[in-house]
Curated annotation (Swiss-Prot):
One of its GO terms (cellular component) is cytoplasm. It comes from Arthrobacter sp. (strain FB24). One of its GO terms (molecular function) is ATP binding. SUPFAM superfamilies: GroEL apical domain-like (SSF52029), GroEL equatorial domain-like (SSF48592), GroEL-intermediate domain like (SSF54849). Keywords: ATP-binding, Chaperone, Cytoplasm, Isomerase, Nucleotide-binding. HAMAP family: CH60. Together with its co-chaperonin GroES, plays an essential role in assisting protein folding. The GroEL-GroES system forms a nano-cage that allows encapsulation of the non-native substrate proteins and provides a physical environment optimized to promote and accelerate protein folding. This is Chaperonin GroEL 1. Forms a cylinder of 14 subunits composed of two heptameric rings stacked back-to-back. Interacts with the co-chaperonin GroES. ATP binds at T29, L30, G31, P32, D86, G87, T88, T89, T90, G413, N477, A478, A479, D493. Its EC number is 5.6.1.7. Belongs to the chaperonin (HSP60) family.
Length: 545
């Protein structure tokens, strides 16, 4: 395909136009008085949202240079959303301000590389101040306040705080659509996976159709079991210990399954057999997780362990196991705390190194099952449009609350950046164009507060000047128009959100400023219509039939 190339100022201005179109659409949503944006969908009802990344994803531009500029800013929003779950609009507003101020200096003859270095040093200094001023979250109320701001709903904030309190910061909180109106929280105790008993004969509670084993041994096998001879040695040892047995294997069939069922019916031996969760490498990993959690080992020929010779020392233990027809829950596995911690850190590093969203999600689920627990928030609404929007808000608020627990909180409302900047720039000693680069950051960090004030119908410059003179942590409550102690009023942002927004915006701004040429696909001319007369022009696309 033919390419078109733009150089120098033309290239940079083309990118900036794309950035501005996207940023102008996104920034109207910033702050408590921000507006919504309606997104048309090819199929189904339109989506109404005030989420920056959702709006950014929908914007496609015709001009090839503008399109590239918009795509670069989408990356800022997406990366901030992935890392922190919020701050996408703040990141976009910061990127726009940095690029605008930066290009003005490049056009005036400043060296782009020196500007970039100055921007990086200033951002590093501001980030250090943000982290130093962060306040650790200690109470459920503080988590609720943070989540409420992200979701724009106090009830959602309280529910997320409750969920985080129960599952811990490593736990997984998933959001599902509900057929009923309102919100509901469902908690899972212990490790749960989506495989139930192989046969209903294993049921111990006929009314609830579930098998409950107290203080059982757990046999974990990475292969099929069909021959009863393989099981005999283990079964005898477990029977002598007078404890029940949970068997997790690729499959259990034939006489091996029949023997377990007969012994259960006769009442001589209580056991339950379930299939291992997952497939392929994911199954191996999940079995290893279960083994570490319960203090057992995966019996597999790959590691030289055979079922026929397995002793009790290879079996896991738990306080309780509950098995239904669809899922198995292991409560309080007897695994070694250090080994579990090691496994958790291994999974965490896999999450950081993974490029796939799907893999990351699955790894996060495994991490939660080992380190915390799983909570499900079920959300309902009157219409499909409202339900989609509500579900998305809750998902963002969950990530926001987790970010707050992780690194702490700072004053919200765009104030933390301005106040951290005041301290950072007082100690920053730079010269020449690097100092100019730092000044670009000094100007740009006012942008989020200015936009919040503008969206609230206030004069941005006046608000920023007023905030500069206030004590640390004090600023504008845009919802009421009053100047208050923001942290005390529950108006806060996770420092991870503010930090990520600034760092990601600066990263893209540096790319804009140091761009000297843009190569884009040449737009194709529209193919001529294939219809006949004027009145049939709309049928041109039917020519292929």
């Amino acid at each position: 395909m033919a390419k078109i190339i733009a150089f120098d100022e033309e290239a940079r201005r083309g990118l900036e136009r794309g950035l501005n179109i996207l940023a102008d659409a996104v920034k109207v949503t910033l702050g408590p008085r921000g507006r919504n944006v309606v997104l048309e969908k090819k199929w189904g009802a339109p989506t109404i949202t005030n989420d920056g990344v959702s709006i950014a994803k929908e914007i496609e531009l015709d001009d090839p240079y503008e399109k590239i500029g918009a795509e670069l800013v989408k990356e800022v929003a997406k990366k901030t959303d992935d890392v922190a779950g919020d701050g996408t609009t703040t990141a976009t507003v910061l990127a726009q301000a940095l690029v605008k101020e930066g290009l003005r200096n490049v056009a005036a003859g400043a060296d782009p590389l020196s500007l970039k270095r100055g921007i990086e040093k200033a951002v590093e200094a501001v980030t250090a101040e943000l982290l130093a001023s962060a306040k650790e979250i200690e109470t459920k109320e503080e988590i609720a306040a943070t989540a409420s701001i992200s979701a724009g709903d106090d009830e959602i904030g309280a529910l997320i705080a409750e969920a985080l309190d129960k599952v811990g910061k490593e736990g997984v909180i998933t959001v599902e659509e509900s057929n009923t109106f309102g919100l509901e929280l469902e908690l899972t105790e212990g490790m749960r996976f989506d495989k139930g008993y192989i046969s209903a004969y294993f049921v111990t509670d006929a009314e609830r159709q579930e098998t409950v084993l107290e203080d059982p041994y757990i046999l974990i096998v990475n292969s099929k079991i069909s021959n009863v001879k393989e099981l005999v040695a283990v079964l005898e040892k477990v029977m002598q210990s007078n404890k029940p047995l949970l068997i997790i294997a690729e499959d259990i069939e034939g006489e091996a399954l029949a023997t377990l069922i007969v012994n259960k019916i006769r009442g001589t031996f209580k056991s339950v057999a379930v299939k291992a969760p997952g497939f392929g490498d994911r199954r191996k990993a999940q079995l290893a997780d279960i083994a570490i959690l319960t203090g057992g080992q995966v019996i597999s020929e790959e590691v030289g362990l055979k079922l026929e010779t397995a002793g009790l020392e290879l079996l896991g233990k738990a306080r309780k196991v509950v098995v239904t027809k669809d899922e198995t829950t292991i409560v309080e596995g007897a695994g070694d705390a250090d080994q579990i911690a090691g496994r958790v850190s291994q999974i965490r590093s896999e999450i950081e190194n993974s490029d796939s969203d799907y893999d990351r999600e699955k790894l996060q689920e495994r991490l939660a099952k080992l380190a915390g627990g799983v909570a499900v928030i079920k959300a309902g609404a009157a219409t499909e449009v409202e339900l989609k929007e509500r579900k998305h808000r809750i998902e963002d608020a969950v990530r926001n609350a987790k970010a707050a627990v992780e690194e702490g909180i700072v004053a919200g409302g765009g104030v933390a950046l301005i106040q951290a900047g005041a301290k950072a720039f007082a100690n920053l000693q730079l010269e020449g164009d690097e100092a100019t680069g730092a000044n670009i950051v000094r100007v740009a960090i006012d942008a989020p507060l200015k936009q919040i004030a503008f969206n609230a119908g206030l004069e941005p410059g006046v608000v920023v000047d007023k905030v500069r003179g206030l004590p640390a942590g004090h600023g504008l409550n845009a919802a009421t128009g009053q100047y208050v102690d923001l942290l005390a009023a529950g108006i806060n942002d996770p420092v991870k959100v503010t930090r990520s927004a600034l760092q990601n915006a600066a990263s893209i701004a540096g790319l804009f400023l140091t761009t000297e040429a843009v190569v884009a696909d040449k737009p194709e001319k529209n193919a001529p219509a294939m219809g006949g007369g004027d009145d049939m022009g709309g049928m041109g696309g039917m020519g292929g039939f």
